[in-house]
């Protein structure tokens, strides 16, 4: 009966709507109305942004975010744009969006939408902007998107899109912006994309791309920015053709598993930004001159040799040269020579951990706005005082972040006058009359791929550009940028205030001007210098204009006769539709009704995570309860200080490990989400990946990838049938060291693990090691200005036997504390002994054996045959790591390189191949691969010292 009443109600409402149209001059096409109603049903609107979508006619009633235009051919109004940016919407994209045949802009950016992208969007052949960034969309990109022949901007970054790139996207011949970064897209970039001749910006960083780096991309004549960081290409070289892309402004291939030499880039005459760091590049830095526009050269974490070219000193705009962690030597050129640095300019030269043995006197006296870092070079050996000591000092290890600004501009005597800041007013600096107080419109925008490392020299010219006649066409004093901040990528967030023009009568924009400014930014009309790259709107802060109703102009141009005809047709259409609905209900009511259970998760939805969450899924309690058989004892696979760990089976066959916090380990919700945010940014093949979380029903759980071969502690246990070969032990040691190196040098902020031990080194199905149990409590401390301190003074939760002995004296933790713990693990790998057992100390036992010339007597006999040279060098490295004096211990990068050298001594036929999990006789959750003389092998080359994955997510973006 209730359902019958609903149908009758609908009929009455429809009839009323149709009759009310007799007084109207405008009406939305019924197909568009129906489509938007379906869209609304698929969405959840917790903040009621779409409350006016309950009105009858979308265009006539000015539905929020809906912009319409008349179509003279049928006399109806049609939906032209759908702007639903940053409205905290959840739910899914309705397939019925494909019915909005006149749609040109579809903008759902920075919401929390889930589900897949409907293939029906391929029907929107008039679409020019497809903007879906910053949601939680999953699945593959539909092939049907290749039918969007008029598309200019394809922006689906910061989602969870997987699968391969469809070749059909090569049909988007008008496309200018291809933004698919920060997803989980796999496979190779289709070479067919080289036919996208109008693409300016190709951003695919932080995905899971493999295969070759296509040389065909160099055939894109309009290409300005190519950014593919964080890919895992198959050890390919950088194509030489990339050095001849005529308009290339930025080339960013950081951490892409690239090999070979650096190509000649001298033909890239407008190149501003080069980042090919964290690869396996070899040879020398090319001597050919870079573009005079170059601001940033990042070559760090490679295998480069030779010297720094002398012509680097002739680069007038250079802001940052990073060549640390290579094998460079020779004379260091004075980069700032023949250059006058302005007060707002800054130059950073990071030369750490190379082979430089001498420096010139000029280099020892850099200007105040030049930073030189020499730590870890031979020239720094035994330096205790003087200017060289300053360049070699520990302070040069600080993480140097690009400049961030939050300025307070002096207003002089204006403070004596009244300007109600609390009411979103502010002084307009530089206005024709002093102390002009006005209400600005706030625009939060982000430069997606800027081609510089320091914004300050560009700030004034950027504001002038935005104000210029080709853009907003306002006075320069009407624009202010008093806050900007760098985010991972790197990307640049800024808050721009736009003030009304000076007037004695008014200090606010009228609604028409507010609408013009909003339209200007929302339709990507801003035209600026190529070095700034593409931009996106994060949010629009209306401030004092919250009560302003922004009316979108709609001129139907319909005659009364046409309107009446449309109304009569619409009434007939809706009456037929209503009759069909009644017939359907009567038939349906005769069927047996099925009761449906109320979903508890709808009553207790997942709390909204922080704005900058990335690549992790929020699970509800029911999902994890079902996956773990109600957290049964049979599902439990471990227990730690955080709580119990369960093996879970999620729909689709995904096997996970669920860490369930015990009562004493629960955090505040803010702290819990902060930890998730940090962990979600950490991506390295030797770190256990966080897949999701749950914060429901008083529970806090973390969902990780499942490691079927258990831990290193399991593999070293005497309970297991088959021992580990030396080659496999070295491989595990090397992978573990690489994971720790990433935490120390590439995590943002850097992390000290504090509890490295065999049980926290897990083994996947191919026996690849993954470091586990690192979290927010282990962050390297930052001072008030965001600068890294060289130690942490929190209470240690480490395990006895692995804790740095220096800590008990200084109560300080440093990266060298992790080095000590890892050294103990190395000794366990070599000897099979526990760190402390029956009064015996592993460090003391090993040192005594080595001093007596009996090193081999403590080697684990289950290792089988092995190379004594490899064992000796491995043991020497382990002992160096376990020195009581932290200064005597090597840095993690040195450890990785030495292990690579030792592993290189292992004959190819003895190296372990990547095998499937081998079940142990002792446990169903652990197993290991064993090198056998009769086995079929492939060389283990999955890791390099420089395969580091940088963080990818914005730290301010609304997520």
Swiss-Prot record:
Identify the residue ranges that face the Extracellular compartment according to the record.
Answer: 25-565
Where is it found, in Gene Ontology cellular component terms? Answer: membrane
Q: Which residues are noted in the entry as ATP-binding?
A: 637-645, 659
Its principal location? membrane
Domain Protein kinase as annotated: residue spans: 631-906
Query: By its UniProt entry, which PROSITE patterns does this protein fall under?
Result: PROTEIN_KINASE_ATP, PROTEIN_KINASE_DOM, PROTEIN_KINASE_ST
Mind listing the UniProt keywords for this protein, alphabetically? ATP-binding, Glycoprotein, Kinase, Leucine-rich repeat, Membrane, Nucleotide-binding, Receptor, Repeat, Serine/threonine-protein kinase, Signal, Transferase, Transmembrane, Transmembrane helix
Q: Which residues are glycosylated?
A: 62, 88, 102, 123, 182, 293, 311, 327, 358, 369, 510
Q: Which Pfam families match?
A: LRR_1, LRR_8, LRRNT_2, Pkinase
Entry EC no(s): 2.7.11.1
- Enzyme group, top EC level? transferase
Which CDD domains has this protein been placed in? STKc_IRAK
Kindly give the InterPro entries that the UniProt entry links to this protein.
Answer: Kinase-like_dom_sf (IPR011009), Leu-rich_rpt (IPR001611), LRR_dom_sf (IPR032675), LRR_N_plant-typ (IPR013210), Prot_kinase_dom (IPR000719), Protein_kinase_ATP_BS (IPR017441), Ser/Thr_kinase_AS (IPR008271)
Name the record gives this protein: Probable LRR receptor-like serine/threonine-protein kinase At5g37450
Q: Which organism is it from?
A: Arabidopsis thaliana
């Amino acid at each position: 009966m209730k359902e019958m009443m609903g149908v009758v109600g609908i009929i009455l409402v429809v009839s009323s709507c149709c009759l009310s149209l007799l007084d109207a001059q405008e009406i939305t096409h019924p197909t568009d109305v129906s489509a938007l109603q379906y869209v609304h049903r698929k969405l959840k609107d917790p903040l009621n942004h779409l409350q006016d979508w309950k009105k009858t006619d979308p265009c006539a009633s000015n539905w929020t975010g809906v912009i319409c235009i008349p179509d003279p051919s049928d006399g109806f109004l049609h939906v032209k744009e759908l702007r639903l940016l940053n409205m905290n919407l959840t739910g899914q994209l309705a397939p019925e969006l494909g019915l909005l045949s006149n749609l040109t802009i579809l903008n759902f950016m920075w919401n929390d939408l889930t589900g897949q992208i409907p293939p029906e969007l391929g029907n929107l052949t008039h679409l020019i902007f497809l903007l879906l960034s910053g949601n939680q969309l999953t699945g593959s990109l539909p092939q049907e998107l290749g039918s969007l022949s008029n598309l200019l901007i394809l922006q689906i970054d910061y989602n969870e899109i997987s699968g391969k790139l469809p070749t059909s996207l090569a049909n988007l011949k008008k496309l200018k912006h291809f933004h698919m970064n920060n997803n989980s897209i796999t496979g190779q970039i289709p070479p067919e994309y080289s036919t996208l001749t109008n693409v300016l910006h190709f951003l695919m960083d932080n995905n899971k791309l493999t295969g070759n780096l296509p040389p065909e991309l160099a055939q894109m004549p309009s290409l300005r920015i190519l950014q593919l960081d964080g890919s895992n290409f198959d050890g390919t070289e950088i194509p030489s053709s990339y050095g001849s892309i005529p308009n290339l402004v930025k080339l960013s291939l950081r951490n892409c598993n690239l090999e070979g030499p650096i190509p000649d880039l001298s033909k890239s005459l407008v190149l501003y930004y080069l980042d090919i760091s964290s690869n396996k590049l070899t040879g020398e830095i090319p001597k050919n001159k870079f573009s005079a526009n170059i601001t940033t050269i990042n070559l760090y974490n490679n295998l480069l040799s030779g010297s720094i070219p002398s012509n680097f000193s002739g680069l007038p705009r250079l802001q940052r040269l990073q060549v640390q962690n290579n094998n460079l030597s020779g004379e260091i050129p004075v980069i700032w020579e023949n250059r006058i640095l302005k007060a707002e300019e800054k130059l950073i030269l990071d030369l750490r951990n190379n082979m430089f043995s001498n420096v010139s006197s000029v280099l020892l006296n850099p200007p105040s706005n030049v930073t030189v870092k020499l730590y870890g070079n031979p020239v720094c050996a035994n330096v205790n005082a003087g200017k060289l000591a300053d360049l070699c000092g520990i302070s040069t290890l600080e993480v140097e972040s690009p400049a961030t600004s939050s300025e307070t501009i002096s207003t002089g005597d204006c403070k004596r006058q009244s300007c109600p800041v609390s009411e979103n007013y502010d002084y307009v600096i530089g206005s024709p009359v002093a102390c002009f107080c006005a209400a600005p419109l706030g625009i939060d925008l982000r430069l997606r791929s800027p081609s510089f490392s320091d914004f300050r020299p560009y700030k004034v010219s950027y504001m002038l550009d935005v104000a210029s006649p080709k853009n907003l066409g306002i006075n320069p004093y009407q624009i202010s940028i008093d806050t900007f901040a760098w985010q991972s990528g790197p990307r640049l967030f800024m808050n721009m205030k736009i003030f009304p023009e000076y007037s004695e009568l008014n200090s606010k924009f009228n609604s028409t001007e507010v609408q013009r400014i909003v339209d200007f930014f929302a339709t990507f009309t801003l035209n600026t210098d190529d070095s700034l790259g593409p931009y996106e709107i994060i949010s629009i802060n209306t401030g004092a204009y919250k009560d302003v109703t922004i009316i979108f102009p709609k001129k139907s141009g319909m005659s009364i006769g046409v309107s009446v005809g449309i109304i009569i047709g619409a009434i007939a259409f809706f009456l037929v539709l209503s009759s069909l609905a009644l017939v359907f209900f009567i038939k349906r009511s005769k069927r047996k009704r099925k009761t449906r259970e109320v979903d508890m998760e709808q009553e207790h939805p997942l709390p909204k995570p922080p704005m900058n969450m990335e690549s992790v899924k929020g699970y509800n309690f029911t999902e994890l309860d079902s996956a773990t058989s109600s957290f049964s004892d049979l599902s439990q696979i471990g227990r730690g200080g955080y709580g119990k760990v369960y093996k879970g089976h999620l729909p689709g066959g995904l096997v996970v490990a669920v860490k369930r916090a015990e009562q004493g380990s629960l955090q505040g919700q803010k702290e819990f989400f902060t930890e998730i945010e940090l962990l979600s940014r950490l991506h390295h093949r030797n770190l256990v990946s966080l897949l999701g979380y749950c914060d429901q029903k008083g529970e806090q759980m973390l969902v990780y990838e499942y490691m079927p071969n258990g831990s290193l502690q399991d593999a070293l246990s005497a309970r297991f049938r088959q021992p580990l070969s030396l080659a496999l032990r070295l491989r595990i040691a090397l992978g573990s060291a690489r994971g720790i190196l990433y935490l120390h040098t590439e995590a943002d902020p850097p992390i000290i693990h504090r509890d490295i031990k065999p049980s926290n080194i897990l083994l996947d199905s191919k026996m690849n090691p993954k470091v586990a149990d690192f979290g927010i409590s282990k962050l390297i401390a930052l001072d008030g200005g965001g600068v890294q301190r060289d130690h942490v003074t929190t209470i240690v939760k480490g395990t006895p036997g692995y804790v740095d002995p220096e800590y008990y004296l200084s109560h300080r933790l440093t990266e060298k504390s992790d080095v000590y713990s890892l050294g103990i693990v190395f000794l366990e790998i070599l000897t099979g002994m526990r760190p402390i057992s029956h009064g015996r100390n592993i460090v003391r036992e090993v040192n005594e054996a080595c001093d007596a010339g009996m090193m081999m007597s403590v080697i684990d006999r289950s290792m089988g045959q092995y190379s004594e040279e490899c064992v000796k060098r491995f043991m020497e490295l382990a002992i160096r790591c376990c020195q009581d004096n932290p200064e005597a211990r090597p840095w993690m990068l040195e450890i990785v390189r030495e292990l690579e050298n030792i592993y290189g001594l292992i004959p190819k036929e003895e190296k372990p191949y990547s095998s499937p999990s081998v079940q142990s006789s002792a446990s169903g959750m652990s197993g290991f691969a064993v090198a056998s003389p009769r086995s079929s092998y492939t060389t283990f080359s999955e890791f390099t010292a420089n395969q580091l994955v940088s963080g990818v997510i914005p730290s301010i973006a609304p997520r």
